């Protein structure tokens, strides 16, 4: 595939010319929903969810047949400061687990009929410690964005992205704070389960990173300076999905931080996205409010690897099946009250 962009300015150009959902399909789907054999509003949020999906797919009676889940993995220079309860080598070990079918996301993808792809990004070369320097050069962040862009299957009709990377809740907290404001304590959570001392280290690292990169004002530059390769890859995949009009189910805190960097650059960048779930990472709720995305599920998950969004795929599948498969009052010969 020819590179879609080679500079961050070219990514910004894409963000300035994003396609919109199809208004006619939205109107037609809403009209059909109003004639289905149920009281108005009886399916709750499923109704608006299905109409949203129809608008992005450009058809009033859509189907979900080719969902795609992509998990990106990366390593972080800040991990050396003790921000995680697990060592950095766990990232590569978990990638092998994904590839061998042994992780939670493998089971969920199989259960809901989704294609699962796993991409490890230069695990042998962690990003720079962002308390000392930008996490990535422009060339490195472009490479990661492009990995995500290329990973999206153009034939997919739903996209879910997730991550694996020791230390990435810390980089996500720094990125969220840089994009949406607030103190480090507002955004830093326990991640993999650090104790109070580990939590204090995470807060210090985020504070130092924010101070070092305080003059960076653009969302993509914040992603470069504070993010990680897998975080940038998720952003690239989310952006590619928008260009292809593929609806996206967002996963947890780290995925939403990646999405937030796009929104910080272009406020309408996430209109094709729905939050799949609210995770147990304490600041995820704050981040969902910042990006304006109420979650579909709240199950206390804090695993990452796209697991919560994968579960929400079942909700979207059900919503779309009802819109497209239910009979109208006229078709069923039922009196419309």
UniProtKB/Swiss-Prot annotation:
SUPFAM superfamilies documented for this protein: Nicotinate mononucleotide:5,6-dimethylbenzimidazole phosphoribosyltransferase (CobT)
The chemistry this enzyme catalyses reads: 5,6-dimethylbenzimidazole + nicotinate beta-D-ribonucleotide = alpha-ribazole 5'-phosphate + nicotinate + H(+)
Q: What is its EC number?
A: 2.4.2.21
Q: In which pathway does it act?
A: Nucleoside biosynthesis; alpha-ribazole biosynthesis; alpha-ribazole from 5,6-dimethylbenzimidazole: step 1/2
**InterPro entries listed in its UniProt record:** Nict_dMeBzImd_PRibTrfase, Nict_dMeBzImd_PRibTrfase_bact, Nict_dMeBzImd_PRibTrfase_N, Nict_dMeBzImd_PRibTrfase_sf
Active site (UniProt):
305 (proton acceptor)
NCBIfam families per UniProt: cobT_DBIPRT, PRK00105.1
Name the UniProt record assigns to this protein: Nicotinate-nucleotide--dimethylbenzimidazole phosphoribosyltransferase
Source species? Roseobacter denitrificans (strain ATCC 33942 / OCh 114) (Erythrobacter sp. (strain OCh 114))
């Amino acid at each position: 595939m020819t590179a879609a962009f080679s500079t961050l300015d070219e990514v910004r150009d894409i963000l300035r010319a994003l396609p919109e959902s199809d208004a006619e399909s939205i109107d037609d789907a809403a009209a059909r929903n109003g004639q289905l054999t149920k009281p108005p509003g009886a399916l709750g949020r499923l109704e608006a969810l299905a109409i949203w999906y129809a608008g992005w797919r450009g058809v009033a009676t859509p189907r979900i047949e080719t969902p795609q889940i992509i998990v990106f993995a990366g390593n972080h220079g800040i991990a050396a400061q003790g921000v995680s309860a697990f060592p950095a080598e766990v990232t590569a070990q978990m990638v092998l687990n994904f590839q061998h079918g042994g992780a939670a996301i493998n089971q969920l993808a199989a259960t809901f009929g989704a294609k699962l792809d796993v991409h490890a990004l230069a695990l042998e070369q962690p990003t720079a410690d962002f308390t000392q320097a930008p996490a990535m050069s422009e060339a490195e962040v472009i490479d990661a964005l492009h990995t995500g862009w290329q990973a999206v299957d153009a034939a997919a009709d739903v996209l879910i992205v997730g991550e694996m990377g020791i230390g990435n809740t810390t980089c996500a907290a720094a990125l969220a704070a840089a994009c949406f404001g607030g103190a480090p304590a507002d955004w830093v959570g326990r991640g993999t389960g650090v104790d109070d001392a580990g939590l204090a280290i995470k807060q210090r690292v985020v504070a130092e990173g924010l101070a070092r990169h305080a003059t960076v004002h653009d969302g993509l530059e914040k992603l470069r300076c504070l993010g990680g390769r897998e975080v940038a890859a998720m952003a690239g995949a989310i952006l590619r999905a928008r260009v292809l009009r593929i609806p996206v189910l967002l996963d947890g805190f780290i995925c939403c931080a990646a999405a937030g960097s796009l929104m910080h650059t272009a406020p309408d960048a996430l209109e094709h996205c729905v939050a799949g779930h609210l995770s147990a990472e304490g600041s995820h709720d704050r981040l969902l409010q910042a990006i304006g995305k109420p979650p579909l599920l709240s199950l206390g998950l804090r695993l990452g690897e796209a697991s919560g969004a994968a579960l929400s795929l079942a909700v979207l599948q059900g919503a779309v099946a009802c819109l497209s498969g239910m009979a109208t009052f006229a078709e069923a010969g039922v009196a419309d009250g």
